[in-house]
Amino acid sequence: GADVFLLRRVQALTEGFSTPMAGDTPAFVALLHGTLDQVRGGTPRTDVERINYNENINSRLIVRSFGGNDYFAVDDNAALTTLDTGAGDDEVQIGQMYGAPRVSVPAPGTVAAGDDFATIETTAGFLSRGATFSLTAYGGTGNDQFTVYSNKAEIRLEGNDGNDVFVVRAFALKNQPGLSTEETTQAIGGE
């Protein structure tokens, strides 16, 4: 079926630890159950599969979705990353726009305790970093869409088979010079 994946670098890992683990660039990959509309609409299911990791992961983080019309949202990463979307009409979103900073305090926050993450204030809202470590995304078969709002490291997007769409947007930063997509983005359409 259709899967919804969330990749995010966070302030600290708290679940399962007596003391929050904040060193070594903590991050997680989560498989959010339910539909993309449920997740976006603020009514996601509570059964989430989450894997915590940090920059000391051996080699590379690889996330495979296999079949289905899957969605990958990347707010940030903490290691070299490969996304393999497999078969289906998939979407990969690198960097997301929010209406407020993603902080846990003051209560009630916009994220769970420890899951705070950096955003950049733009003229359109608060933008997540996208990718701090190099990222490669493979579209596999199907008509895939790749959208980049922000990247702080080189990213490579490979459409593979099907009619794929590549969108790279730049946002003006608020109160500072520069744009949100200043790093290298390679888009390869495939066959």
What are these regions (language model features)?
Residues G1-E191:
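Acidic, glycine-rich low-complexity segments
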